[in-house]
Amino acid sequence: MGQPLFAPRSSPGRRRPPWAVLVGLVLVVAFVGVAVGGYALGKRFQQADPWDPFLLRAYLDRPLDTSPPGHGFWIAGYYVDYDSTSLEAVKIRSNHMDQVVIFGYGFDRQGNLIGKDQLLIKGITGKQKRVLLFGNLTNGTFDKDTAHAILTDSRVQDRAVQNIIQTSESLGVAGVQIDFENIPNDDRNAYTAFLKRLKTELSARSMSLSIAAAAKVSDSKTGWGGATDYAAVGQIVDHFYIMAYDEHWRDGEPGPVASLPWVERVIRYATGVMPAQKIVLGVPLYGYEWGTDGKNNRAYGSSRMARRMTETTPQVKWDPVAGENVATYKTSEGDRIAWWPDQRSVDAKLRLAYQYNLRGVALWRLGFEPDDWWNQMGAFRVTPSK
């Protein structure tokens, strides 16, 4: 890279350069382990490779992106602290993004935060684009009892709100995102009231509020996202991120992760009950592989899935209706079937979001995409088209 991987040792009395402090933080994280808050997102993903301190300095030495979010079509992305490729994507490509959602903290059932400090992100992108996520995550799952306690127990809620505000102010972010999933159906009104309270608190501190909501095609009041009242919540929050993926998921029947007809139904319902310009469409950058016997089902990022196909002799087909790849093949585990998106899938969803005048799209998650995808996504952000 034209420079030594490690700088010479500092002379006595000389301040340690900022990147060295951040590398030290990362090394501490590597030894402490992911159990101290580097949890996976519920049912969707496994932990990826650990941090690579040899490469980290190169990214941290790049100029900090301090540009504000754009006024046109947005591209947002989710950053996770347990995968170095996610860090790389933010540092190198944040100039193509309008919001970076930091997959940050869970709660215990008393309203205390679970997770490690997100200080590293300060060296990666500017405050104007940072959004800090808080979810009802306990022991790596979206916990019903945690959600119920925060939404219905005033003392627990007070503690949770205080922790959200203090942590967000300390880190320095433009906004907060709430990702409460698997909420008890009877807590639907309580969830709406909680978001209304939080919106008031955050607005007084010049911070925005967004939520991550499970995809719906009607006002269903049951199921994984039944407690999210799209119409009511859509009037409260600044941005409404819809997780338009897991149409089929790892522990279910094989099928597209997010077929185009299904995604369009999700958009049509949402735009019928809230302003389109509040909606940010979640776009998956991953796929699933299922055993035909229902065993050893797995999730892979798009880059890893493409490599996976080179390890077998698959029959790969592009499904133009679903807008995804489908493949069948054999491994030592038996017959397998996989569905996953590629750049064509992402491009189709960008155009669909723009066609319906949405605020933009959000990528789950940063680090799953091949780097060359950003050429097209960055160009679309500047000059979107239907």
Question: Can you say where each PLM-predicted feature lies in the sequence?
Answer:
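Conserved, mostly hydrophobic/aromatic
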Residues: 100, 178, 240, 281, ...
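Glycan-binding loop/region signatures in secreted carbohydrate-active enzymes
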Residues: 49-54, 138-147, 283-351, 381-386
